[in-house]
Amino acid sequence: MAATTSFSSSLSLITKPNNSSYTNQPLPLFPKPFLKPPHLSLLPSPLSSPPPSLIHGVSSYFSSPSPSEDNSHTPFDYHNDEDDEKPREECGVVGIYGDPEASRLCYLALHALQHRGQEGAGIVTVSPEKVLQTITGVGLVSEVFNESKLDQLPGEFAIGHVRYSTAGASMLKNVQPFVAGYRFGSIGVAHNGNLVNYKTLRAMLEENGSIFNTSSDTEVVLHLIAISKARPFFMRIIDACEKLQGAYSMVFVTEDKLVAVRDPYGFRPLVMGRRSNGAVVFASETCALDLIEATYEREVYPGEVLVVDKDGVKSQCLMPKFEPKQCIFEHIYFSLPNSIVFGRSVYESRHVFGEILATESPVECDVVIAVPDSGVVAALGYAAKSGVPFQQGLIRSHYVGRTFIEPSQKIRDFGVKLKLSPVRGVLEGKRVVVVDDSIVRGTTSSKIVRLLREAGAKEVHMRIASPPIVASCYYGVDTPSSEELISNRLSVEEINEFIGSDSLAFLSFDTLKKHLGKDSKSFCYACFTGDYPVKPTEVKVKRGGGDFIDDGLVGSFENIEAGWVR
């Protein structure tokens, strides 16, 4: 368990293929200056660079539309009202070592993680000739890859990424994995999380001559590795990560190694598994392991670096151990119900949250329904505890897709009706309890209430399977500015009046922590309390047009000096 495992800051544990282990000698410490990069070839552009295969062994293929294609209908042109109601997932990462079908397995695993990002997808493999080969593209995994593209990605190890932008604009150049050539060879990286000191690091690197090709915070990591003087290779990664603040679960690939890293607080999940042929697999969730028939072994521990090569799996402490602060919203909303996250079943957590709601906030009703899909398991728990039947009162159109995790906000009026259709026979004349996972701005909840009343519901009682969200997240989750969060501005009674329900109740924060028991101190609750484990140096602010800024490069920010005030 991540919450109970500690590491020595000076020792390295090596796991051999036969599962025996021994301890390495203590590793030397290295200075960490910001050096001027001599000759870097980071993230070569397909338009301006020499043939990628000639740059430090990096081969790059970008699946972007040709100039002649009609690009007017991209995935980013569509958005609806449900977007305002959900904290949007960050990203998903996959790493595979030791399987001749690495690219195809990576492709399948990314399918399993598609719910974590729909803007773009990419895979990097290492060919038999030790060349890093990349295919990235905008859109869903199935839109970016096909059989012919996977044929261009041979090799026995690979990393993959599905993207939702929390830092950096939505464009092809920001789609990961990123690949860079530097003086010691080539490296690819896929990152889930968000770096709160990104702007500071980027400014320091640019002042010393670094040239950036993207607006993503992940590129900072590659520059830090490139300028590091530490040896051997994994120490360069440790050297770079010790300068980072915030959330990061990352997988790296080089010509002969696969590396997995998780930040010392363990904000975002990262798990390790193994296939029957011995191939090692890393993924953001266990659902990805299940799909490719890899057996779950354990989490990558907070603050751990795992290096996989021909000699086995080596574990190294990243930096002194902190008390883990794992994102509680992985259990409330982000992860799939069939995943095991932070050592707990997501399904069981959500079911218990629903049971708690039924116990703490009962109401006379005839039927329990869910806002699909994320509210279903909690609604089942509520129904089971209350003894009231669960029925499918809202039907979700899955053909629309999870468009709320796409940042464009051009279509807002038809979102709820486009995605959710009421079942009049379930609702008409009934007192209805509606279970949802969260309320962010409140706009979608009000429209759902109105939709149910129009379908004949006699009463509508909203039950929310999480505490009120009162503060923005800076650790890899796209949330609005605090001034746009309805629970930060209004009381529960005022929110109930705003959305038009007959009653409204949230999961109690104290009861949530009580349910987590001895592990309660291992979770991050910043979105519920405003108490940040790693203080953000910039605060999200509402843009004049009504949009919020969550990009670490574009837009204006207000500095905060003396802690967080909500």
From Swiss-Prot:
Residues 1-58 form a transit peptide. Residues 70-87 have a biased composition (Basic and acidic residues). SUPFAM superfamilies: N-terminal nucleophile aminohydrolases (Ntn hydrolases) (SSF56235), PRTase-like (SSF53271). Residues 1-13, 59-68 have a biased composition (Low complexity). Residues 1-28, 58-87 are annotated as: Disordered. GO terms for cellular component: chloroplast stroma; plant-type cell wall; plastid; plastid stroma. It is found in: Plastid, Chloroplast stroma. Its EC number is 2.4.2.14. This is Amidophosphoribosyltransferase 1, chloroplastic. It comes from Arabidopsis thaliana (Mouse-ear cress).
